[in-house]
């Protein structure tokens, strides 16, 4: 039993009590490729066309063994604690489907944050509890732990947060993980743009911790849709139980393996993006219509600007696409600006100054 922050005592995390009963009883779909390990000389199990159209007539490895081994080496996380999804949106959806009973359970989502947590919960008919972030976009731990109840199964946290760009307080995130009996999902899509190690080193310390990362941002592989989910092997086993049998295509696996060999290139890109982020922050503050540029640990800046909606449409008319966040809580009159190449950033600054 735990007693934290003056709240009532709560039971320790127990995974089996958290998983939906039908999922616990579920016999997962199993292909012959699941049951057979290694390479065979004859494949007559999956009703494939035996005549190769290039190399794509066979189904891909359903377990992505080689790719997980490469990720394991980079992230220092065992392969059996890695789940790969079709973007991070797939594990987000699977976590909700595995642990939340439609019409009964709830998730908690501090706002503002990445919108797909809410969309996935709504698609699955899961109630959503919301707690506002503080004015500087950090966690209100007391409010979060007071808002959850016995039916709250998941808490989604994004750090660095989208759309604000800031890292959440490390200590506050740990307080939420320690004070909650369900799963806490920490989405670290933008973690490569910080000097911070993130929460991967704490996976074995907190059995209810799940960490999401992606190849879409710093690695420059958004088109292949490859999201990484790190958790205890028990949680990963549940996700593998309910995932589609061949959820990562061969093309995506090959592209990811090739991309992950270019660590030095990725690091150079990150260095350049951070340098441009600092330059953009400085130059944006000199534009009269800009009243605030929020501190960022990501590859974008949240900017408070006069008549943001109008500015957005004027930029669109000039073939410059940014993200209008002015209708999002705590983001009145804000645009989110991705850090582009120096040329792209120069074009954006030039047009903003001309408006």
Where on the chain are the PLM-derived regions?
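Conserved PLP-binding catalytic core of the aspartate aminotransferase-like
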Residues: 274, 286-318
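PLP-dependent enzyme catalytic core of the Aspartate aminotransferase-like
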Residues: 6-11, 317-318, 327-355
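PLP-dependent aminotransferase class I/II
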Residues: 208-286, 293
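PLP-dependent aminotransferase-like
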Residues: 101-157
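N-terminal "arm"/small-domain region of PLP-dependent enzymes with the aminotransferase-like
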Residues: 4-74
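Active-site pre-lysine segment of PLP-dependent enzymes
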Residues: 122, 139-150, 163-184, 188-221
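Short acidic capping loops at alpha-helix termini that bridge into adjacent secondary structure
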Residues: 78-82, 103-106, 151, 188, ...
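Phosphate-binding glycine-rich loop
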Residues: 68-106, 124
């Amino acid at each position: 039993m735990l007693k934290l922050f003056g709240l009532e005592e709560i039971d320790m995390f127990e995974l089996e009590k958290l998983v939906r009963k039908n999922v616990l009883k579920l016999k997962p779909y199993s292909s012959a490729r699941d049951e057979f390990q290694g390479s065979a000389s004859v494949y007559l199990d999956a009703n494939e066309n035996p005549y190769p159209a290039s190399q794509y007539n066979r189904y891909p490895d359903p377990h992505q063994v080689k790719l997980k081994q490469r990720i394991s080496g980079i992230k220092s996380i065992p392969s059996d604690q890695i789940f790969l999804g079709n973007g991070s949106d797939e594990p987000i959806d699977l976590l909700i489907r595995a642990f939340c009973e439609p019409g009964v359970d709830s998730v908690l989502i501090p706002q503002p944050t990445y919108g797909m947590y809410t969309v996935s919960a709504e698609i699955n008919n899961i109630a959503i509890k919301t707690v506002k972030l503080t004015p500087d976009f950090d966690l209100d731990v007391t409010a979060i732990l007071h808002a959850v109840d016995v039916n709250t199964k998941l808490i989604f946290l994004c750090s660095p947060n989208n759309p604000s760009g800031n890292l959440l307080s490390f200590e506050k995130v740990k307080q939420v993980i320690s004070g909650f009996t369900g799963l806490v999902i920490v989405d670290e899509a933008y973690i490569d743009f910080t000097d911070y190690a993130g929460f991967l080193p704490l996976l074995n310390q907190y059995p209810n911790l799940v960490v999401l990362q992606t190849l879409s941002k710093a690695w420059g592989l958004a088109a292949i849709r490859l999201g990484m989910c790190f958790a205890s092997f028990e949680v990963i086993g549940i996700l593998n139980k309910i995932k589609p049998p061949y959820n990562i295509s061969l093309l995506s696996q090959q592209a990811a393996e090739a991309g992950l060999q270019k660590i030095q290139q990725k690091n150079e890109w990150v260095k350049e993006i951070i340098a441009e982020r600092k330059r953009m922050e400085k130059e944006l503050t000199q534009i009269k219509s800009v009243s605030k540029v929020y501190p960022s640990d990501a590859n974008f800046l949240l900017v408070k600007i006069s008549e943001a909606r109008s500015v957005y449409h004027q930029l669109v008319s000039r073939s410059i696409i940014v993200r209008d966040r002015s209708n999002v809580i705590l983001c009145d009159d804000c645009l989110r600006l991705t850090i582009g190449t120096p040329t792209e950033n120069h074009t954006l600054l030039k047009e903003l100054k001309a408006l």
